[in-house]
């Protein structure tokens, strides 16, 4: 299941801290809704966070500029979120294959190209 929260950037909390708190809140909400309980999140240096004692429960959290998403499932999963915005062609060359660049550049407007680029970017990041 996927859970989403939005917020207005600004205020007394640094946005990354706010996103972290919202992400963990969404995770706990999702765990309660799907499994009727929560688990402690643990993370070893350099590894992905996991739920202590919940080998059959997976989660993934992503956040960016006022948007936080969390997915919870009984199988491997991934999520990513980005705001659609202008991007540099050099970035596209680094992260997209030739056929993917063609897909992006086929967009009829700059807005369509941005949407196509970030669709690919988030798909790749979620894996």
Describe the predicted segments one by one.
Residues 1-127:
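Core catalytic alpha/beta fold that binds nucleotide/phospho-ligands
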């Amino acid at each position: 299941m996927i859970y989403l929260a939005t917020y207005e950037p600004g205020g007394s909390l640094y946005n990354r801290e706010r996103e972290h708190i919202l992400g963990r809140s969404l995770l706990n909400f999702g765990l309660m809704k799907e499994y009727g309980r929560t688990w402690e999140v643990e993370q070893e240096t350099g590894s992905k966070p996991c739920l202590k004692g919940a080998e059959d429960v997976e989660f993934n959290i992503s956040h960016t500029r006022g948007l936080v998403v969390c997915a919870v499932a009984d199988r491997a999963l991934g999520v990513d979120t980005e705001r659609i915005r202008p991007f540099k062609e050099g970035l596209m060359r680094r992260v997209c294959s030739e056929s993917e660049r063609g897909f992006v550049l086929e967009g009829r407007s700059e807005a369509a190209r941005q949407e196509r680029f970030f669709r690919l970017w988030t798909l790749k990041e979620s894996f």
